[in-house]
Amino acid sequence: MARTVNCVYLNKEADGLDFQLYPGDLGKRIFDNISKEAWGLWQKKQTMLINEKKLNMMNVDDRKFLEEQMTSFLFEGKEVEIEGFVPEKDQD
């Protein structure tokens, strides 16, 4: 049976992550409150941020910036702003 969480991002019950993917207290908070679906959405945004802003994950400042963006996206509902990115329109 899949583990479910009350996902803060999606605002609904959904399948939870299989294990803690991020270290520390923030990782525990993500594990307890974020669904697989929401984490997948974040991973897409994270990849775009890393590529567009040319972030270096060996750089402490870049990692801190990415963590701030992740917290804002997952827990505060703030959209990640990526310069020049225009989301595709839904086609009926």
Curated annotation (Swiss-Prot):
InterPro entries: Fe_traffick_prot_YggX, Fe_traffick_prot_YggX_sf. GO terms for cellular component: cytosol. Pfam families: Iron_traffic (PF04362). It comes from the Bacteria. Transmembrane segments: none annotated. Keywords: Iron. GO terms for biological process: cellular response to oxidative stress. GO terms for molecular function: iron ion binding. PANTHER family: FE(2+)-TRAFFICKING PROTEIN-RELATED (PTHR36965:SF1). Belongs to the Fe(2+)-trafficking protein family. Could be a mediator in iron transactions between iron acquisition and iron-requiring processes, such as synthesis and/or repair of Fe-S clusters in biosynthetic enzymes. This is Probable Fe(2+)-trafficking protein. The lineage of its organism: Bacteria, Pseudomonadati, Pseudomonadota, Gammaproteobacteria, Alteromonadales.
